[in-house]
Amino acid sequence: MRNDLKLLPWEICSEADGWNDEFLESVFFLGNGRMGVRGYLPFEPDSRPTQQGLFLAGIFGEIKDGITDFVNLPSPVCETLLLNGTTAVLASPIHRTLDLKSASFYADFTLAAGDTRADVRYTRFFPKELPALLMQRFEIHVQSDAELELRSGINLSSCNSPIPDDQVKENTELVQLAPLQFVTDDGSLFSCTFETVGTGLRIEQEVQFHAPEFTQGIVQNSGAEVTCPLTAHAAAGQTLVVEKLVCIRTSRDADERIAAAPGDWSFHALWGAHTVAWSHTWQNCDRTLPDEELQIGLRYSMFQLMASCAAHDPTVSIGARGLTHARYKGCYFWDTDLFMLPFFLKNDKTAAKNLCLYRANALDAARDHAKKMNAAGARYPWMAALDGSEQCETWDIGCSEVHITADVAYALGEYCRETGDEEFYLHKAAPVF
């Protein structure tokens, strides 16, 4: 059992050696409900295609006809630092902090190339009310005069490793489900466009920098990553700052708040609006407990629910591992209807309604599934994803889970009872009942 986490009322902290720690990367997950990334870091020299990526609600690609997997998308957490022309490597422990109050992730560490050292403070957040954006900030403090080159962009190597529903089978296959289609570079920003295999969903990641002390170079595509070089001279004791905005939009966006990247943006202004939004959220749902460990445990659990729920999108639900992993194909299970929905019924009725709308709008797929099972009416599937059809491939699990329809009906009934939403009852819930 790991005991190397420091638990505070609003923060989880750790100090560890080395880049690769899958346990910590799970703990330090960050998201805004629409999309999220695990707690991996920029500057890691080794590529880990299945562990480094970004998950975005509703983005599925086909691994076989009619069967999808939750796409591990190319990652915009992709940086390399050169000091005096030499690639810098990790030269200290890494201190990570997840601040639940502001839904922010920080990391502090030192990079070195020969005798040249740079202390790095890294910040990451997903603006709560601007769900298309990912913000990152790099504060690089050099201990001696140095020529800096920061190569920043998008890691193209992210892959899925589909795990068979028959768990006696091994999963050794790597599949890239969102290959690069093209790169656009207009000098001040660049974008990469991807398309999912089989489902044909388009994803655009646009990257912009605020780096007044750096010179921005020409975008380069190595095949493994698309990066832009930023170069600068730093005097001993100087701290240089790079701010990176990534705007991610898709061909299936349903949340009306999703918009193009702002033409004129301020990291601090976006940060301020983000913290205010989370402050309002916590004022509504926070509960205080006398025990510190129980307190952070409760807040962490609530944060995970909110960070994994696309509250304004009625076309998706909360997957088996939220936005952290493609296990179980990223499918939606009855756990959301019975165990997660009650939190949203009490704290975010918009989210609760949209979780229920996902099920109600999948009624036709449930009817089709009932016919395939030689049954009357509707039968909701064990594993659901993009269109509500059954995604489970083994008869001994999917065919035997007969309680799902009752779970869905119960959840819709609880929403109607809690909210008194007559329109939803008449037009959405009643046909299911």
Positions of PLM-derived features:
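A conserved hydrophobic secondary-structure block that centers on an alpha-helix together
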Residues: E129, E414, E418-F424, K428-P431
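Beta-strand segments within the central parallel beta-sheet cores of soluble alpha/beta enzyme folds
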Residues: R121, R151-S152, S317, K353-Y358, ...
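Acidic/polar, glycine-enriched structural segments that form the non-catalytic walls/loops
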Residues: M1-Y328
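Short, glycine/acidic-rich beta->alpha junctions
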Residues: L130-L133, A224-V226, C331-D337, Y425, ...
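Substrate-binding groove/exosite segments of carbohydrate-active enzymes
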Residues: L270-R417
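Conserved short hydrophobic patches within well-ordered secondary structure
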Residues: F138, Q205-V207, A409-L412, A429-V432
